[in-house]
UniProtKB/Swiss-Prot annotation:
Transmembrane segments: none annotated. Belongs to the Fe(2+)-trafficking protein family. It comes from the Bacteria. PANTHER family: FE(2+)-TRAFFICKING PROTEIN-RELATED (PTHR36965:SF1). Could be a mediator in iron transactions between iron acquisition and iron-requiring processes, such as synthesis and/or repair of Fe-S clusters in biosynthetic enzymes. NCBIfam families: PRK05408.1 (NF003817). GO terms for molecular function: iron ion binding. InterPro entries: Fe_traffick_prot_YggX (IPR007457), Fe_traffick_prot_YggX_sf (IPR036766). This is Probable Fe(2+)-trafficking protein. Keywords: Iron. One of its GO terms (cellular component) is cytosol.
Length: 91
């Protein structure tokens, strides 16, 4: 049976992550309060931000920015969108 958590983003019981995505207290908080669905959506959104904004993931400023965006995304706050991104149409 899958481990269930009360997801911070969706405000409901959903399947939890299989393991903490980061070491330490931050990773444990994500493990305890973020669903697998929300985390997968964040990973896709983060990839889109990196690609569309041409972010350098080796830059400390980028890491701080992405951490802030992750917090906003997973907390249901307003978060940045990729400028000029047009989702593919379902034809």
């Amino acid at each position: 049976m899958a481990r269930m958590v009360f997801c911070r983003k969706y405000k409901q019981q959903l399947e939890g992550l299989d393991f903490p995505p980061y070491p330490g207290a931050k990773g444990q908080d994500l493990f305890d309060n973020v669903s697998k669905k929300a985390w997968q959506e964040w990973m896709a959104h983060q990839t889109m931000l990196i690609n569309e904004k041409r972010l350098n993931v080796m830059d400390m400023g980028t890491k701080v920015y992405l951490t802030e965006q992750m917090h906003k995304f997973l907390s249901g706050e307003g978060y940045d969108q990729a400028d000029g991104y047009v989702p593919p149409s379902n034809q």
